[in-house]
Amino acid sequence: MRTFLKLIKINIMKRIRLPIVFTLLLALFIACNNANNSSNSEDLGTNLTLPIIKETKGLKQLYVNNEPFLIIGAELLNSSASCIEHMKDIWAHIRSLNVNTVFLPISWQQFEPEEGTFDFSLIDNHIKSAYENKLKLVILWFGSWKNGESHYTPDWVKIDMERFPRMLFKDRKISNTISNINRNCLNADLKAYKKLLERIVQVDKHGTVLMMQIENEVGLLGSTRDFSPEATKLFEQHVPGELIKYISNNLNKLKPNIYKRYVYNGSKTKGTWEEVFGKSPNTDEIFMAWNYAKYINELAKAGKAIYNLPTYVNAWDASGGNLIPGVWPSGGPNYLMLDIWQAGAPDIDILANDNYSPTFGLSAANFVHNKNPLLIPEACAIWMNDTLSAASKAFFCFGHFKAIGFSPFGIDHHIYHSNHPIKKAYEVLDNLRPLITKAQVEDKINGFMEGDNASPASFQLGDFIFKPGYDLQKNSLIKGYGLIIQISEDEFIVSGNACHVGYESADSSKPNSQLLSVEEGKFVNGKWVKKRTINGDEFGIKLPPNPYNIASDVYLDDISILKIKLFKY
């Protein structure tokens, strides 16, 4: 095609006797075609390649500019990005905390205030400001649904309930959630989302936007499913063959709740939802999850055709209420519904874990399923006084779960002040980022966190077994944490805070072990630079190296990087 167009261009120059009108029309055709090609190109204007999710040795990682990338992230409070002026002082503060990626919402209500009229001011300014502050962005599309309801839809969608119907509860009361099976709802959302992607292509010439989140914590609150006549009619029809085929082809990979519902009901190849999965609230949620997944997959597929960015959905996770859907948004991509979402939304790259759980590690582990990489875009419930756990959870996620990214919610809240421990923790994680991503693929890393049942009491790296310990005199607010990376047969990088690590040989032929050396330092341009040699009273795998009295808050951010060498005999 390009050769053909080049010949046309040459022909135009040679045939100067062609009628002027015809010449202008050809030139216009060439210009339009070039514009179309560039809008869908991987050339971002600076020869940068698009971010991708790449699988290596069975592990999926985010690649940015052809290099593995860790999202050392932070999400804004919901309303902050609604105003350019409000964000002016926030950008620099976020950067000062050593964040590399901001999770930033764009509201459909503001983006398309009147049908067919789009306001690009917010997305334009946010991309520009992020780039100027050397930050990457993950754009959160608050479209049809946010936290199980539809408060971010434009007024013209909310008002016209005939055109954009709501879901109904079992008692036939009208919900605040627009339908996930209505084509008008989907088409309107789809049109706006595509417009957003088209705009990002036009203005993001530096690869600032890394990923797209479609909707936010979808599902129906207050009911197991939509009981509208339209939804009930669909519920009484046969389960789509596409879903049954996926389930039967992946039986050994399914979560227990899906496996049991399908197999214990006879592994049917056709039938209604209740015939195939049995009559239960869980079946209602399977039905809802399928419809949400199909709806959102259409947005993902259309968006990628415009600008092929990695795309994910996030989950308000299933917990409480004796596991009855509707206590959490029924049908969302929670850990019980991961299989249904993977079947119904193949164009979604990640099913992400919004993790405010008191059993943090268990919730995270539930999402490491069938090659779904762990991404935690929201964590640390500041409304429940969880104000200091971001550092420990970040280390734990990257080390133990080989996460793609971690982000506390509400980074612009005053609790994340300039001396918050996340600042030093993120500085250290950024310093170790190349080692972490390499070790994740090679399975030469592990992480740990005090007080979490999913945290390993011991683990093996190479020929050595490590045992984290937390029995230090310290402020009760400080929870110990860390990660260990194997960099050679007998050398390891250890980093974290408020803990110590025991070690022993895992080699039965050489059952004894000894710590030969400990250095404190950091990496500069990929090379280890020693700050000091640790010995005497400070000798050992101690974080920090001199924990005489860490009752003071000053030690909240006393995060060291140690290089240790072990010997077995």
Stretches with model-predicted labels:
Residues I296-L309, Y335-K438:
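Catalytic-core region of carbohydrate-active enzymes that cleave or remodel glycosidic bonds
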Residues G73-S82, P105-S121, K170-K191, V276-A293, ...:
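The substrate-binding groove and active-site-proximal loops of carbohydrate-active enzymes
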Residues S392-S509, E520-G526:
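Aromatic- and carboxylate-lined catalytic core of secreted/periplasmic carbohydrate-active enzymes
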Residues I30-A31:
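C-terminal motif of bacterial Sec signal peptides marking the signal peptidase cleavage site
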Residues H86-M161, Y292-I306:
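Aromatic-lined substrate-binding rim segments of carbohydrate-active enzymes
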Residues S38-N100:
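N-terminal carbohydrate-binding accessory modules
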Residues F164-L338:
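Polysaccharide-binding and catalytic clefts of secreted carbohydrate-active enzymes
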Residues D471-L472, F492-Y569:
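C-terminal beta-sandwich/jelly-roll accessory domains of carbohydrate-active enzymes
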